[in-house]
Amino acid sequence: MINRSHYTLFCPIWAFFGFVCFTYSSPVIPEIKSLEISEVSFQSEKDLPYLSKHYLSTKPVKHEDGIKLGDLMKESSKPEAILKIVDSFVATQKGIKAGKTDSFLVAKGGKLLLESYFRKGRINYPHYQMSITKSYTTLALGRAMQLGYLSMKELNKPIHQFLKDVKVDKFAKGASSITLQDALCMTSGIRIPKDRANARYIIKNPLKGQGHAQAIFEITEAVDSTKGQYKYQSADTSLVMQVIESVVPGGAEKLIREELFAPLGIDFYVWQEDLSGLPKAAAGSSLRSRDMLKVGQLVLNQGRWKGKQFIPADFIDRATSPLVKTNGNAHYGYFWWYESYEVSGKTYLSKQGRGAGGQFIIILPDIDVVAVITAHNKGMGGMLNQVCTALITAFSR
C-alpha cells in the first residue's frame, strides 16, 4: 500500500488541482546512520551526496525531539500553494537557485505539517548556518537576561562597561559611547579599514578573550559621524558575544549549550569558535532543520517554552521589531529581520532569521506559522518572497 502523504505535487493525489504526475518522493525519510557530531563540518556537508529522490511528507512522522505533528491537508485550506513551492525545489534540483534547497519545513499552531528534504538535506544532519547565527546570538543574550545576568535597561549601557579588561584610553574617538543596543542594531558606527585589520596587528596584539573587543575599538575609524548609521558587519556581533561572555558565569558557550539549547531539546549541533576563543557570533553554527523550527516557535511564542517564560517577552518583542530601516521593504531589529507582505489586499508581518546561502527561519505571527528553509545558494530573496506569499495564501482565511 502506497502512503499518499509522501507524493509530490505532481502525483495522482493532486490530480484534482489540475496537475500532471511526473515524480514520486522517497517514502523513507533521509538520514545518515550512526552520525557522530565530530563528523559534522562545513566541508563534510559539501561532500554529502545528493539524495537519489527527494522526500516529502504532508503528515510528518514522530521522532524523539518533542515536536508536535499535524496534517497539512487538514490544516490548510489551500495546500496546493505550498506544494507548488515544494515542486519548484524538486523540478530544479540540479538547476537554478530554488533547486539548491536542502530542506523545507512548515508548522502551524505549533504542529509540524510539512517536512521535505532535497539534495543534501538529511533529518539528522546539522546544516551549516551563516548569518542566522547572529539571530541565535540574540536569543542567547535574551536567555541571559531571563536568568538575571543583565536587564533591559542595560541595553543602553556602553559596551566597554561590561568588559573589565579593555583599555578605554586606547579606543578610537567616540568608540567608548557605543552601547549594546547600537551593536545589536548594526548601528555602532564602527568602520574598520582593511589595512588596519592585518596580520601584523593580530601578531602584535593577541585577540584571545577581550583582546578581540580591544582590537575592534582600537582600529576602527572615529565613530562620531557614523554612529547610528546602519552597516551590516561582523564586528558588532562579536561585541555582543563579548558581553554575553562577560556577564554570564561560566561564559557564553556554556550558556548556549546548557541554558539556551538543552531546554529546547537541541543537543546535536556545532558552534565554531572565533579568534577570541568565544563562540562565533556572525556565522559558524550548524543546526538540524527541526531544531531551527523550535527556535522559530520560541520566537513566535514571545519567548515562552513549555508554558514557562524562557526569554523575556519584551526583549523578544524589541529584538524582532522594525528598529532600523535597511533596504527595500526590510527592517532590522536585534540581528533579526522584519518584513511585510501584501496578499489579497491585506498586509502580513514576518519576522525572519536569515543566513547567506539560504538558511531561513520564517515567522508569520498573523497566521501562527513558522517555516524553515536550508540551502546552499546566495541571492534567494526572490524565492523567500514566493515562499512567504505561498504560506500566507495557504493558511489565511
Model-predicted segments: where are they?
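N-terminal leader/targeting segments and the immediately adjacent pre-domain N-terminus
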Residues: 22-122, 147-151, 397
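Structured C-terminal helix/loop/strand segments within mature extracytoplasmic catalytic/sensor domains
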Residues: 26-38, 353-397
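Active-site SXXK
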Residues: 110, 128-155, 183, 240-244, ...
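Short, well-structured active-site flanking segments
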Residues: 143-164, 176, 247-271, 306-313
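Active-site-adjacent helix/loop patches that line small-molecule binding or acyl-intermediate pockets
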Residues: 161, 171-266, 289-293, 297-298
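Active-site-proximal alpha-helical segments within enzyme catalytic domains
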Residues: 236-243, 283-305, 359-375
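Mid-domain, small-residue-enriched loop/turn segments at the edges of structured enzyme/sensor domains
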Residues: 259, 263-289
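Active-site Gly/Thr loop motif
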Residues: 266-267, 317-370
